[in-house]
Amino acid sequence: MKKLVLIGGGYGNMRVLHRLLPNQLPDDVSITLIDRNPYHCLKTEYYALAAGTISDHHIRVSFPEHPRLDVQYGDITSIDIVQKQVLFQDREPISYDDAIIGLGCEDKYHNVPGAPEFTYSIQTIDQSRETYQKLNNLSANATVAIVGAGLSGVELASELRESRDDLNIILFDRGNLILSSFPERLSKYVQKWFEEHGVRIINRANITKVEEGVVYNHDDPISADAIVWTAGIQPNKVVRDLDVEKDAQGRIVLTPHHNLPGDEHLYVVGDCASLPHAPSAQLAEAQAEQIVQILQKRWNGEALPESMPQFKLKGVLGSLGKKAGFGLVADRPLIGRVPRMLKSGLLWMYKHHNG
């Protein structure tokens, strides 16, 4: 019996599971899924958990059940790609015939002194819970500094504003205009929403140091009762420690078939993979679809195509609290209630089809 090991239960490997189970898995292949949590977490909603507008229950999805699916739990310390083993701190290694690395990402602090020690995070469900506890326990008129005004920072700031209108919220953005990679009309809409809802945006920010209760912007100190870091990501440490070829962002360079060069048994999906698009749940799922096709061909002894089709991504949706949002769908900017409703609908569909 061949063993396919899925290293991490994120969006990419969940899509692999749902494509292979219940009836697309060859009779001579079993699957082992490894994760630290006994459920799949909706990472795209961690901002709402941290802001206190949803509970754990709303962002947990059970792993599927199947006679040839074995779910194992533990904290992975390393992957031995020569011996084809996944190593743990407190349990025996797990061997694989084929494996898909889907360990996701962590915060990237850009060598800013004090940032790892004195900021909160929304990168894992445990970190998001810790951030919620801190934000929820703040007294009225306390100040929250959110460093980084990408999608995560924007959604956290807006959700927190809706949850705690008594807080002073500062959002640090390194660009001239918030969400500057989006069309200007959309960026101005988001900037105006924050202005109307009393969220202070500091554009052209450059965080040079963080101390307990203090953010230094261009070396100027700004006091805050809580500091949340949403200013960049990097691959999981297990991936960073792998001695394989990586791109400038530390993501693993792959063949057109999504496996490591020279190792057709080890694949990488999602945030750890070097791909032509920014990391996202949507991209991880699109890549997973192709990996499943490649695995099935290899298991069946069929020839592989020289290249795989380009990914067709539908767009991006973001929320501004529960009633407003923004998005870019088929290169068309959307603002207001419609993108928020679309995002809520997609979340419901995901939970309905995967739960």
Curated annotation (Swiss-Prot):
Which keywords does UniProt give here? FAD, Flavoprotein, Oxidoreductase
EC class (word): oxidoreductase
| GO molecular function term, any single one | oxidoreductase activity
The record's annotation in InterPro entries points to:
FAD/NAD-bd_sf, FAD/NAD-binding_dom, NADH-Q_oxidoreductase
Segments spanning the bilayer are none
Task: Tell me its cofactors.
Answer: FAD
Q: Report any Pfam family annotated for this entry.
A: Pyr_redox_2
Question: Can you tell me which family this protein belongs to?
Answer: Belongs to the NADH dehydrogenase family.
Protein name stated in the entry: NADH dehydrogenase-like protein YutJ
Q: Which organism is it from?
A: Bacillus subtilis (strain 168)
